[in-house]
Amino acid sequence: MPSPTCYLLLNPTASRSHHRPRLPLPAAAPPRRRVHVSCDARRTGGGGGGGGVKREAIPAGTGKAKKQVVFFDAAPPVSQRGGGGGGEGEGEGEGEGKVARRKENAALGLVRRLTKRTLSLLSNLPLAISEMFAIAALMALGTVIDQGEAPSYYFEKFPEDNPVFGFITWRWILTPGFDHMFSSPVFLGLLALLAASLMACTYTTQIPIVKVARRWSFMHSAGSIRKQEFAESLPRASIQDLGVILMGYGYEVFTKGPSLYAFKGLAGRFAPIGVHIAMIFIMAGATLSATGSFKGSVDVPQGLNFVIGDVMKPKGVLSFVPDVFNTEVHVNRFYMEYYDSGEVSQFYSDLSLFDLDGKEVMRKTIKVNDPLRYGGVTIYQTDWGFSALQVKKNGEGPFNLAMAPLKLNGDKKLFGTLLPLENSGSSNVKGISMLARDLQSIVLYDQEGKFVGVRRPSSKLPIEIDGNEIVIEDAIGSTGLDLKTDPGIPIVYAGFGALMLTTCISYLSHSQIWALQDGSTVVIGGKTNRAKLEFSEEMNRLLDKVPELISVNEKKIDSKQSAT
């Protein structure tokens, strides 16, 4: 049987000369030779010549599709040379493109390596623990160092000529911003670094674990099942009965032929991711509070008012003024409650809020630990003061005498004022001195500084001093209010709630069970990520409930024995 050959189909009209002619004109088309190569046969002769080659004239385009190879018997025209030059340029362009792609791939490879190395560094557990300890240390330091004071306070308390502990001066406090610890670049930078570590750990460790845990992995080998942490064999048992019992224990059960896979507690695998997200929420809320909040304080006498925006100061670059800052606050009344010993027990402020149109939008009486909240602004009752005394002298008045705070050692307050009895324009003014520690009682002294008596503002009883009848009409107190906007508080609260929930969920055990029906025997294996002793006990209780199968012959024997 002859071997098939490759057929070279030559155009008989083409010239076979191979001499190089002169350069033709562009318009002249050179003669050419068309060769059809058929790949459905192989050559019988050796070498590359024409010996042993069967030639057949077949018109181009008929029969099987064949590859055309065109040879020019003469040099191509100038225009075609230009096309050839374009081919060379095209080849050069392809070469440049390959070089560019090679450089791009090298750059991408470098980025991938750097990213992988960075993720590996950030997800390092000792690094994350060190970051948390550093943040805790800074928080503790922030409770020791008085926050938000004027620079002169730190100059005085941490002088350079007498450093605290021999080295701590005001420079150690003010330079890194520890006078505002929770908005300092050091503290916020550590928070950002810890957040990056948590995200890297989640991406490189927790998410792959969850992906693996979600797969339904059947085991088709009894040897693989016996390698699990818990392994047991049940002779004369059915895998279907085992699946029903597992579902009764809260397992999700899947079967495929003789194989069974069951699991429960998958939420415990998701919980670490939730813990990380909750911690990131807490840190994001704390950062927003430090850089996007407003804070202010004001002392307002009873009966006066103020605009919220006039007393608020931004704390960071993310602090944006809300519309609620145009709200006006009016102090309707300020009063205090006292213990039997006379000490102040609680103080109250009756406040009304008015919008730009003068309409009252809210009214509330606030006290310590019971603030007013409106439009994202919280108004706290934090302090009190003595604003003025209303006094009548010899039936004239009442006169409003401003009470000035007097500095004392200790926490007790003392306020004082003077009712002049002579011309106030003289250089040596004398008068009646009045002192008070609270709004209940006023102590009076004459021009010589001698004690005269005590009067309660509510009694309105007159007292004779240096020939003048004095009546204390009223004591006007002032309320000390702290105002704050903190957009990060809802985020922090949500983060703490999620942290508590996900921490509890993380204690759920993720248990997995595999089983294989091997003839009449069921091979069972299982593992869990925590509570391994409890899992072993649960498996023993579970397998004790799997019914044993009895064959028909055994039933007959049992029936005969019972009959006899």
UniProtKB/Swiss-Prot annotation:
Q: Would you tell me the protein name for this molecule?
A: Cytochrome c biogenesis protein CCS1, chloroplastic
What Gene Ontology cellular-component terms does the record carry? chloroplast thylakoid membrane
What is this organism's lineage?
Eukaryota, Viridiplantae, Streptophyta, Embryophyta, Tracheophyta
Q: Which UniProt keywords apply?
A: Chloroplast, Cytochrome c-type biogenesis, Membrane, Plastid, Thylakoid, Transit peptide, Transmembrane, Transmembrane helix
Gene Ontology BP annotations: cytochrome complex assembly
Query: What positions does the transit peptide occupy in this chain?
Result: 1-38
Oligomeric state and interaction partners are given as: May interact with ccsA.
Family membership noted in the UniProt record: Belongs to the Ccs1/CcsB family.
- ATP-binding as a keyword of this entry, yes or no, is no
The subcellular localization recorded is: Plastid, Chloroplast thylakoid membrane
Q: Where is this region: Disordered?
A: 1-36, 76-99
The record's function comment reads: Required during biogenesis of c-type cytochromes (cytochrome c6 and cytochrome f) at the step of heme attachment.
Predominant location category: plastid
Per the record, membrane topology reads:
Multi-pass membrane protein
Q: Which PANTHER family match?
A: CYTOCHROME C BIOGENESIS PROTEIN CCS1, CHLOROPLASTIC
